[in-house]
Amino acid sequence: MPTINQLIKKGRKSAAVKTKSPALQSCPQKRGVCTSVKTITPKKPNSALRKVARIRLSNGIEVTAYIPGIGHNLQEHSVVLVRGGRVKDLPGVRYHIIRGTKDALGVEDRKRGRSKYGAKRPKA
């Protein structure tokens, strides 16, 4: 426990805030190339085959990113844009692929929440 004089001289050191997406290096998004595309199973109590891709970012860091939406066209060597945002039931997946940019096409026949999946407005 410090004395009053020690606190006056030095002061308290505030804890450094730890980033949740360190591979992006304070950028909103990063470009990357898919090295592999696969499915993984979520942790209990959920059950599914979640689509993920292993991506080498433009800064050389390799991350695992989730592919949102139903169906995708990604394969090895696809160029994608990656944003932060974890998937709660997939351990180690802390990034999302942005649909509708670069080689990742938007979700087909999406009517609601289109902007999150890169879907164009349907014809009336």
UniProtKB/Swiss-Prot annotation:
InterPro entries: NA-bd_OB-fold (IPR012340), Ribosomal_uS12 (IPR006032), Ribosomal_uS12_bac (IPR005679). Residues 104-124 are annotated as: Disordered. GO terms for biological process: translation. One of its GO terms (cellular component) is small ribosomal subunit. The keyword Kinase does not apply. The modification 3-methylthioaspartic acid is found at residue 89. Disulfide bonds: none annotated. This is Small ribosomal subunit protein uS12. The lineage of its organism: Bacteria, Pseudomonadati, Spirochaetota, Spirochaetia, Spirochaetales. The gene is rpsL.
